[in-house]
From Swiss-Prot:
This is Xanthine dehydrogenase. Its EC number is 1.17.1.4. It comes from Drosophila subobscura. [2Fe-2S] cluster 1 binds at residues 48, 53, 56, 78. Its cofactor is FAD; Mo-molybdopterin; [2Fe-2S] cluster. CDD domains: fer2. The gene is Xdh.
Length: 1344
């Protein structure tokens, strides 16, 4: 190493108080990999590998020598290099508490507040909260908001997490002290009224153990008392990469002179992503965080100087402090900066990322570069010239960025720091950012304006406007800026500015990133927001008249802020005489919640590595449709540690053909590939990194085939459908109904797909056993299918294959059939090599390979009367299946059976087409076609209401099904309480009051509008295929009275095991604590159905009851003889009397199996789950941003087995549906390549996206006679209520359009992204844009 100081190559750090010393650390290894693979601390999870989900969050503690304090930081272990941990203390979820010792209050409160479902995200959320409390023992709700910006949860809907952790905050305490309703656990809704039939207390806060800071683990004294590790220069080398950590500026600059192409790594938030996903190799990495000059902070009268390696959170903290202390006029750049930093990534990223890295990376969508460029920020750079340190000053502004991710700073130079100038009274700096999601998202477009006025006037003296997202670099608009100089800033000038910007900042129709019209509109819209914001300041200062900005327009400058959550959960109280040990109807904590909160819960990839285990890496297709002309794995096999390559050549044609129903798929592509991401082959190697590196060396040559079909419209054009389609369902006399109709209308609607984004990706471990047996541990919702197809691929009988699934980190249907993509190659490799083999897909692989929810297109013609009564509907349903059938036929059928939603239509013809395209095969997803079908139905009901001029609510009521009505598939509705749900929800939500409030708001605001929407739902409960409606159970009672229960369902996070324990506890009359469920395994319960279709509790619960009844029957004589004995005594007596204490249970759902020809009188569904949701939404008409202000839900779920779990399912389903209809957009190239392969581009709802007021009520007094203990299914039915946000948004857009003279209907596809919202709000700014003619260009992305 250059420089005079001797470097060390020994890595030393602490993990959970234990010292770790490594003499040969790998610079390419992340902290997450080190924790999991070397230290076997598997509580920390891999969710995305790009710092976007927070599942890998740990706390890093280090001694700040300058401040003489210990800093505790939540960080993403998936991005943090382990080499950067030298001299640090790492705390993981295992290090703060356990079920075997003592739970930490952070773990306890999350679990007992029902904030953990699948549990895969739970350790990361726990550690984000823990790190917050280590820095602020009593945080504010805003602190919580910030702490969780970098964490995602796909299951809970976030509400219970916030409710549990709210108990730590300042806002939670009130003047009532111990009598406060929030402390004593009684809630504020009168749940303690003994006369009430409802309860509102899901957990008792008063029983939480207090937070005691004195009990926290101490910072290692060795690190606190000595700076030896901080003063050491480091050099760590591997075969490919060398890591340097200099401690002086001289060393750093000498290193940069010796290695000009070396990457400086501070937070590794950009380089880590490049290395992981772009497979960049940087042979030299330099970590400059201990170079004093790069950590310097100094202040002067004119500015604050931050060293280039100072973290964004430290910059944010100091700037906020100065904003509080200094006059407002001096801190406008500071305020602008902290405003932008709030939306810069998540807290875990901001804790380690630095401003210098942001500048030097030069991303065209950087959040900070437009601010710094507009401000003309002064930078200090240094280099070694003739052995001496040479410094110079560089200004950000015109000419600083010289190209994509390039600037004027030379390769051998190092950025030392940035000056933040204080502003003057006549200077204003504002910035705005628009992204797909507000929190933790990259910008679509951002803009910053730095303007100085002539003294005490609104005449522009000088102005700089910078934009991100409009070119390969941050760009200025000098021509438009010059136009504004010496002009008063007013509406007239803004008209000219808007026109000028449209010309100065063009964007090619095929530009990367897509959304061309939207991005161009944002440029003008964001500048208009800046104008409104600055004019407001000028007005406040008395420089311009108070009415210079019309009152209706002032709110256009405002941004959405996350409100403090308000919520209520109401459910039916259990009878006062119900035995204490009877758990049915009680809000029991999820059976695995405490293990999940402590990191003790074991998921598939947490299973300890076995001796001789190999890892499987996949070779994936890089073509959408092509013939494979060459497949050469020789380069991969030449690598040391690579043991085998598998392809279709290793299987017979028959063995290679697989599929859940139709065997039209292949384990490995044979001859042709049909989509991007199809598995072509697999490499077995010693470890994951090597397997993946080797897989990239496999050479595949192709011959392109055509046509490539990606979209539904292309499939229709080419007639590309699966055989036997279209299919039709008919009812009544269509011709007569349309001939007699007073009105007819033809319309269409369309919605995109949705990525499952279970936090745990697909994973499998296969272990060969003796006697030609194979044991699989698999993240699957359908163990029996995996067993069957593994047996098929290996030509083994099924009894030699055992598939086990202990728990899944989420599934949502995505692990029902697609798990075979991973399990089959893993099983084959293990069987052939006779060694254990493992694979867990990376997030980008999982998203590319495993398919999504089906996109749908609907075309309909409807007949109706003048009062809105629908008399007939002719509808065509098209789904995009991808390249193989999978379950698409059944998804289509459910859409066809659900399109009418809650509305009775006497005459129906519904046709369905399964479109075959060159996309990965789409598959089951929560709702299974039902939400798509009901989406069409809600469009129809609103079209009818609009045409006849009646309120939608009135038309809904007019058309509602009533008890006794018959559906278009001949099922009579026996109990249909939709009107009761509606009435309760209208009252709960103050619907009519809110409508009046919305009307008033919309009259008073031009650029912000609100809408409200009511959504009813009717979801049929049963598998569409009759034979799947069955389940089995096995009950084993041991001599000590403990019970081991097995059933055919899989615990995915939905609380199935918890409910089964509750069912067995009531049936046996024993406490839940005596019952344990270990796993789901095909050698315990054979021939299981998938855990899907929301029937898991129904069919498995009845099987459990059957087993319990058999056991009870055997025990009955003993109980009669010993009526005063205990359960343990009865069991002991039974054992000695040689009574079998093992029982099997079985259940087959009765009365179903409808077929229009062979079984027309049977039911299609066992029953229906109904509900109603009402959402109020506000939109920003200038940006397309939106916020859900409130959501109220009333669900009829019969007699709830567990209200806490059921309400959690309702909230989680709503948020998933909300994501489907508003946020989650899959981006494909015109050739079918998926762009959105991780949380960086694919946005599911975050903590800040939940409704500001979120109320859920369970309908009381509505037992269901057709399911276990009078309950109803709850997993899928609430999802469609998320569409209430979509239709509320559409109502708000309509109000915006009316403001500009636009009436009538307008198209709005789902999801209603910010781009679609903004472009639907047509106005004077969007009218400035020229729209290129369709077909004159190739778009960057298309909608499948």
């Amino acid at each position: 190493m250059s420089g005079q100081q001797q470097a060390t190559s020994v890595l030393v750090f602490f993990v959970n108080g234990k010292k770790v010393t490594d003499t040969n650390p790998d610079p390419e290894c992340t902290l997450l990999t080190y924790l999991r693979d070397k230290l076997r601390l598997c509580g920390t999870k891999l969710g995305c590998a790009e710092g976007g989900c927070g599942a890998c969050t740990v706390m890093i503690s280090r001694m700040d020598r300058g401040q003489h304090k210990i800093r505790h930081l939540a960080v993403n272990a998936c991005l943090t290099p382990v080499c950067a941990m030298h001299g640090c203390a790492v705390t993981t979820v295992e290090g703060i508490g356990s079920t075997r010792t003592r739970l930490h209050p952070v773990q306890e409160r999350l679990a007992k507040a029902h904030g953990s479902q699948c549990g895969f995200c739970t350790p990361g959320i726990v550690m984000s909260m823990y790190a917050l409390l280590r820095n602020a023992e009593q945080p504010s709700m805003r602190d919580l908001e910030v702490a969780f910006q970098g964490n995602l949860c796909r299951c809970t809907g976030y509400r219970p997490i916030l409710e549990g952790y709210k108990t730590f905050t300042k806002e939670f305490l009130c003047g009532m002290g111990e009598k406060c309703c929030r402390v004593n656990g009684k809630g504020c809704g009168g749940g303690d009224d003994p006369e009430s039939v409802t309860d509102d207390t899901l957990f008792e806060r008063s029983k939480f153990q207090p937070l005691d800071a004195s009990q926290e683990p101490i910072f290692p004294p060795e690190l606190q008392l000595s700076n030896a590790y901080d003063s050491e220069s480091l050099v760590f080398s591997s075969e490919r990469v060398t890591w340097y950590r200099p401690t002086t500026l001289q060393e750093l600059l000498q290193l940069k002179a010796a290695h000009p192409a070396a990457k400086l790594v501070v937070g590794n938030t950009e380089v880590g992503v490049e290395v992981k996903f772009k497979h960049f190799l940087y042979p030299h990495l330099i970590n400059p965080t201990l170079v004093a000059e790069l950590q310097e902070v100094r202040e002067s009268e004119e500015s604050i100087y931050f060293g280039a390696a100072v973290s964004l959170m430290e910059i944010d903290a100091l700037l906020r402090q100065r904003i509080e202390e200094l006059p407002e006029a001096q801190t406008r750049l500071f305020q602008c900066t902290v405003d932008m930093l709030h939306y810069f990534a998540g807290k875990q990223i901001r804790n380690v990322a630095c401003l210098g890295g942001n500048i030097m990376t030069g991303s065209p969508i950087s959040d900070m570069n437009p601010v710094l460029t507009a401000a003309g920020a002064r930078l200090e750079v240094a280099s070694i010239v003739e052995g001496k340190i040479s410094q110079r000053t560089v200004h950000m502004g015109t000419g600083f960025f010289t190209g994509y991710r390039r600037n004027v700073i030379e390769p051998q130079e190092v950025l030392l720091g940035i000056h933040f100038q204080k502003t003057t009274p006549d200077q204003h700096v504002v910035a705005f950012k628009q992204a797909r999601r507000r929190d933790d998202d990259i910008a679509i477009v951002n803009a910053a304006v730095n303007v100085r006025f002539e003294p005490k006037s609104n005449v522009v003296a000088e102005i700089s406007m910078a934009f991100g997202g409009m070119a390969p670099t941050t760009v200025l608009a000098p021509r438009t800026s010059q136009l504004m100089v010496k002009q008063p800033l007013d509406h007239q000038l803004l008209e000219r500015v808007a026109e000028s910007l449209c010309g100065e900042l063009p964007l090619a129709a095929s530009a990367p990133g897509g959304m061309i019209a939207y991005r161009r509109a944002l440029v003008v819209s964001l500048i208009f927001k800046a104008y409104l914001a600055i004019s407001s300041k000028l007005s406040e200062a008395g420089i311009i008249a108070g009415d210079a900005i019309p009152p209706k327009e002032r709110s256009g400058a405002e941004l959405f802020h996350t409100p403090t959550l308000r919520s209520a959960q109401l459910f039916e109280r259990v009878c006062s005489d119900q035995p204490v040990c009877d758990p049915i109807g009680r809000p029991e904590v999820h059976a695995a919640a405490l293990k999940q909160a402590t990191g003790e819960a074991i998921y598939t990839d947490d299973i300890p590595r076995m001796d001789g285990e190999l890892y499987l890496g996949f070779v994936l297709s890089t073509k959408p449709r092509a013939k494979i002309t060459k497949l050469d794995a020789s380069a991969a096999l030449a690598l040391e540690g690579v043991h085998a390559f598998f392809s279709h050549k290793d299987l017979t044609v028959h063995e290679n053909e697989v599929g859940p129903v139709f065997h039209d798929e292949h384990v490995f592509a044979a001859g042709e590939v049909h989509c991007y991401g199809q598995i072509v082959g697999a490499v077995a190697a010693d470890n994951k990194a090597l397997a993946q590196r080797a897989s990239r060396l496999v050479r595949v040559e192709y011959e392109d085939l055509s046509p490539v079909i990606v979209t539904i419209e292309q499939a229709i054009e080419h007639g590309s459908y699966f055989p036997d389609y279209p299919r039709y369902v008919t009812k009544g006399n269509m011709a007569e109904a349309f001939a007699q109709a007073e009105h007819t209308y033809e319309g269409s609607c369309r919605m995109g797909g949705q990525e499952h984004f279970y936090l745990e990706t697909h994973a499998a471990v296969a272990v060969p056993r003796d006697s030609d047996e194979l044991e699989l541990f698999c993240s699957t919702q359908h163990p029996s299918e995996v067993q069957k197809l593994v047996a098929h691929v290996t030509s083994l009988p099924a009894h030699r294959v055992v598939c086990r699934a202990k728990r899944l980190g989420g599934g949502f249907g995505g692990k029902e059939s697609r798990g075979i993509s991973v399990a089959l190659p893993v099983a084959l490799a293990a069987y052939r090599l006779r060694r254990p083999v493992r694979c867990m897909l990376d997030r980008d692989e999982d998203m590319l390979i495993t398919g999504t929810r089906h996109p749908f297109l609907f075309k309909y013609k409807v007949a109706f009367s003048s009062d809105g009564l629908i008399t007939a509907c002719d509808i065509e349903c098209y789904n995009n299946a991808g390249w193989s059938m999978d379950l698409s036929f059944s998804v289509l059928e459910r859409a066809m059976y659900h399109f009418e939603n809650c509305y009775h239509i006497p005459n129906v013809r519904v046709g369905g087409w399964v479109c075959k395209t060159n996309l990965p095969s789409n598959t089951a997803f929560r709702g299974f076609g039902g939400p798509q079908g009901m989406f069409a139905g809600e469009h129809i009901i609103r079209d009818v209401a609009r045409i006849v001029g009646r309120d939608v609510l009135d038309v809904m009521r007019l058309n509602f099904y009533r008890t006794g009505d018959t559906t278009h598939y001949n099922q009579q509705l026996e109990h249909f309480p939709i009107e009761r749900c509606l009435d309760d929800c209208l009252t709960q939500s103050r619907y009519h009051e809110r409508r009046a409030e919305i009307a008033k708001f919309n009259r008073e605001n031009r650029w912000r509008k609100r809408g409200v929407a009511v959504i009813p739902t009717k979801y049929g409960i049963a598998f569409g295929v009759m034979h799947l409606n069955q389940a089995g159970a096995l009950l084993n009672v041991y001599g000590d009275g403990s019970v081991l229960l097995s059933h055919g369902g899989v615990e995915i996070g939905q609380g199935l095991n918890t409910k089964m324990i509750q069912c067995a506890a009531r049936a046996l009359g024993i406490p839940s604590e005596l019952i344990h469920i270990s796993e789901t395994a095909t050698d315990k319960v054979p021939n299981t159905s998938p855990t899907a279709a929301s029937v898991g509790s129904d069919i498995n619960g009845m099987a459990v009851l059957d087993a319990c009844e058999k056991l009870n029957k055997r025990l009955a004589p003993i109980k009669e003889a010993l009526p005063q004995a205990t359960w343990q005594e009865w069991i002991n007596k039974a054992y000695f009397d040689r009574v079998s204490l093992s029982a099997t249970g079985f259940y087959a759902m009765p009365g179903i199996g409808y077929h229009p020809e062979t079984n027309p009188n049977a039911r299609t569904y066992s029953y229906y789950t109904n509900g109603v949701g009402i959402s109020v939404v506000e939109i920003d008409c200038l940006t397309g941003d939106h916020q859900v202000l409130s959501t109220d839900i009333v669900m009829d779920i019969g007699s709830s087995i567990n209200p806490a779990i059921d309400i959690g399912q309702i909230e989680g389903a709503f948020m998933q549906g909300y994501g489907l209809f508003t946020l989650e957009e899959l981006m494909y190239s015109p050739q079918g390549m998926l762009y959105s392969r991780g949380p960086g581009m694919y946005k599911l709802p975050g903590f800040a996206d939940i409704p500001g007021e979120f109320n859920v009520s369970l309908l009381t007094g509505a037992p269901n006679p057709r399911a276990v203990y009078s309950s109803k299914a709850v997993g899928e039915p609430p999802l469609f209520i998320g569409a209430s946000a979509f239709f509320a948004i559409k109502e708000a857009i309509a109000a915006a359009r009316q403001e500009h003279g636009l009436t009538g209907d307008f198209p709005l596809e789902a999801p209603s992204t910010s781009a679609r919202i903004r472009m639907a709000c047509q106005d004077k700014f969007t009218n400035l844009l020229e729209v290129p003619e369709a077909g004159s260009f190739t778009p960057w992305n298309i909608v499948p």
